[in-house]
């Protein structure tokens, strides 16, 4: 991965749920967005009022859960990712 995240940004590869057994096909705009993903890149963190960096609690390889409408989708090397702030992540697998 040749993409360096800045500040407290996290790059996530969404883990899709496969529910193809239903005969009803919904348009993409009506489908529920994924809320689980694998972290592929993290920024260094943000600076506090004293000028010290607050390190990230999320690391590359973590499987995380995030808010449904969190982040922005980007495409990098023909693959889709979600970029979000660390604060949009609500849990990680232990």
From Swiss-Prot:
InterPro entries: Chaperonin_GroES, Chaperonin_GroES_sf, GroES-like_sf. CDD domains: cpn10. One of its GO terms (molecular function) is metal ion binding. SUPFAM superfamilies: GroES-like (SSF50129). The keyword Chaperone applies. Keywords: Chaperone, Cytoplasm. Its main location: cytoplasm. The keyword Chaperone applies. Signal peptide: none annotated. GO terms for cellular component: cytoplasm. Pfam families: Cpn10 (PF00166). It comes from the Bacteria. Together with the chaperonin GroEL, plays an essential role in assisting protein folding. The GroEL-GroES system forms a nano-cage that allows encapsulation of the non-native substrate proteins and provides a physical environment optimized to promote and accelerate protein folding. GroES binds to the apical surface of the GroEL ring, thereby capping the opening of the GroEL channel. HAMAP family: CH10. Belongs to the GroES chaperonin family. PANTHER family: 10 KDA HEAT SHOCK PROTEIN (PTHR10772), 20 KDA CHAPERONIN, CHLOROPLASTIC (PTHR10772:SF63). This is Co-chaperonin GroES. The gene is groES.
